[in-house]
Amino acid sequence: MAAAAASRGVGAKLGLREIRIHLCQRSPGSQGVRDFIEKRYVELKKANPDLPILIRECSDVQPKLWARYAFGQETNVPLNNFSADQVTRALENVLSGKA
């Protein structure tokens, strides 16, 4: 799982500085992201206490996963209509450098 991958320091080797998750509080397209946060955020944060993991809610925003690396480099992955499991896989890909 993403928490296990991050706890092995995989993201740290890539210079990962921060994870941000943007989502809408109400839209159906963000439901999987809301489910992911509800079910897996605590485990992920416990496995990565030094990595900032920010949750940003905003009305009518398209859900996205943002990763900020060293030197200000950023990547993002659209999460629209993803299930919680698909969000987990997207996060694992970011942590392993495949995103």
UniProtKB/Swiss-Prot annotation:
Function: Accessory subunit of the mitochondrial membrane respiratory chain NADH dehydrogenase (Complex I), that is believed not to be involved in catalysis. Complex I functions in the transfer of electrons from NADH to the respiratory chain. The immediate electron acceptor for the enzyme is believed to be ubiquinone.
Modification type N-acetylalanine: residues: A2
Entry membrane topology: Peripheral membrane protein
The UniProt record lists the keyword Transport: yes
SUPFAM superfamilies: Thioredoxin-like (SSF52833)
GO cellular component, one term: mitochondrial membrane
Sequence positions bearing N6-succinyllysine: K64
Principal location class: mitochondrion
Assembly notes: Complex I is composed of 45 different subunits.
GO process terms (BP): aerobic respiration; blastocyst hatching; mitochondrial electron transport, NADH to ubiquinone; proton motive force-driven mitochondrial ATP synthesis
Cystine pairs: C24-C58
Connected disease: Mitochondrial complex I deficiency, nuclear type 13: A form of mitochondrial complex I deficiency, the most common biochemical signature of mitochondrial disorders, a group of highly heterogeneous conditions characterized by defective oxidative phosphorylation, which collectively affects 1 in 5-10000 live births. Clinical disorders have variable severity, ranging from lethal neonatal disease to adult-onset neurodegenerative disorders.
Molecular function GO terms recorded: NADH dehydrogenase (ubiquinone) activity
InterPro entries, per database record: NADH_Ub_cplx-1_asu_su-2, Ribosomal_mL43/mS25/NADH_DH, Thioredoxin-like_sf
Lineage summary: Eukaryota, Metazoa, Chordata, Craniata, Vertebrata
Keyword hit for Glycosyltransferase: no
Family indicated by similarity: Belongs to the complex I NDUFA2 subunit family.
Protein's UniProt name: NADH dehydrogenase [ubiquinone] 1 alpha subcomplex subunit 2
Location in the cell: Mitochondrion inner membrane
Entry keywords, A to Z: Acetylation, Disulfide bond, Electron transport, Membrane, Mitochondrion, Mitochondrion inner membrane, Primary mitochondrial disease, Respiratory chain, Transport
Leader peptide range in chain numbering: none
N6-acetyllysine modifications at: K64
